[in-house]
């Protein structure tokens, strides 16, 4: 169930679902697994807010276990394409593809709440049963290219050498807010609403 917010206007009362009301304040909620429909919704909101006023920041709150690489990269590409600065605020967790998105916010405007967690790892893939050996080789090559691309993005976003990112992302690597800050994925740990 999505909560509804009632607002008093000069014309009377107006009700919004909570996400529409937050969008009015340039806030986008990226929550849950990253998949195509969710990514398309986030992209549409980014494009709408940028077209509305590209001189104002957009606030992207992130709480996700990760998900589809292609859907996540579509969000990242849109964040980089629009003119508006995108502030990212990690709450709960940014894991897997979520770390790519959260760390791709505008440098100097990447935040994390004190009890949130970050997790990097190598991308996962599979070919399923009954797959021909040639198809398995193609899938393995694609997975390796994807891993190299994601590690380069993480290296660029954190300022860490790609070799370090490669080693650190070999297995699930969970980080506290302080560790995430020290690694370079975020710029500040928020202890109150500093975005106003």
Curated annotation (Swiss-Prot):
Q: Which gene encodes it?
A: clpP
Q: Which CDD domains match?
A: S14_ClpP_2 (cd07017)
The keyword Endoplasmic reticulum is assigned to this record? no
Query: What species is this protein from?
Result: Streptococcus thermophilus (strain ATCC BAA-250 / LMG 18311)
The compartments listed are:
Cytoplasm
EC class, as a word, reads: hydrolase
The record's similarity note reads: Belongs to the peptidase S14 family.
What is a single Pfam family found in this protein's UniProt entry?
A: CLP_protease
Subunit structure of this chain's protein: Fourteen ClpP subunits assemble into 2 heptameric rings which stack back to back to give a disk-like structure with a central cavity, resembling the structure of eukaryotic proteasomes.
Location of the active site: 96 (nucleophile), 121
Q: Which UniProt keywords apply?
A: Cytoplasm, Hydrolase, Protease, Serine protease
Q: What is its EC number?
A: 3.4.21.92
Name by which UniProt lists this protein:
ATP-dependent Clp protease proteolytic subunit
Does the record bear Glycoprotein in its keywords? no
